[in-house]
Amino acid sequence: MKKLVNFHKEPRPRACDLVAAWPGIGNLSLIVTRYLREKLAAEEIGEIEPFTFFDPIGVMVKDNIVETPQFPEGKFFYWHNTAGKKDILFFISDEQPSYKGYELANFILDVSKKFKVQRVYTFAAAIAKIHHTEQPKVWGVATDTSLVAFLKKYDVVLRGRLQIAGLNGLLLGVARERAMEGICLLGEVPSYTTRIPNPKAALAVLKVLLQVLEIEIDLSELAKIAEESDQQMKRLAAQAMGEYIDRYTRPVWPPLEDEGEFEDEEEEEEE
């Protein structure tokens, strides 16, 4: 393990939860996790050696000089809960590996055992047929029926059957393989906004997470960002509507150039 991760500090908690995040649709997982980490002032304690899990696919060039290959970062952070409840171990990664996701998920859980992690939390986007002005709902899934019953205490939609792509879902599958508790909270995002960050959905997820973890942080900054993002989503909604009209509708009258030709023909007949 020490060859794959470098720890600057190794806390020894009595009990801990893991909050892990990788990039995904709407950047939801990273927004939730980074915001929570920053507000809790969680301390960076280590990072993984990326060579085992990632392969560079190119290089950057600056002033006509090729730079050395760059690897994505995957860092661990730690927050001590002074209220006497469970601490939080964070893992945040810049990228998802192309083909070694299963190995990385197992490795993250190996590290988690070292910190006495009892439950794993991940987050993802749920693409839904909603308008960006609607309040997004939060869906929930878990690794066993007792946790599903636990989620019923909160404002969470239990959809029953769905698929979670990438490490934000795979980590929970591996957690179940290893008989570890795990919960994934998914925020609804409109289908036409999947390519941009969605702080509004992230805010909805974070509100539920804070209730589950029984901790409090200031959400005003994220709420302001979510409000500002509505303008960008409004433009995307208009664009999506225009594309829909172009693709699925036809004009009920002839094009203007056709009308002109028809009028010319009439004039010739009159002569």
Which role does the model predict for each range below?
Residues E38-A42, K113, V156, R176-M180, ...:
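Generic secondary-structure signature for well-ordered alpha-helical cores
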Residues M1-S93:
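N-terminal short beta-loop-beta anion/metal-coordinating cradle
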Residues T193-E271:
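A conserved C-terminal secondary-structure "cap"
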Residues A21-G24, I92-E95, F123-A126, G187-E188:
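Fold-independent oxyanion-binding glycine-rich loops
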Residues R34-E38, N106-L109, K200-L203:
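Short, solvent-exposed amphipathic alpha-helical segments in soluble enzyme
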Residues K129-L210, Y248-P251:
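Catalytic cores of processing enzymes, dominated by hydrolases/peptidases
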Residues Q96-S146:
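Internal, conserved structured core segments that host functional sites
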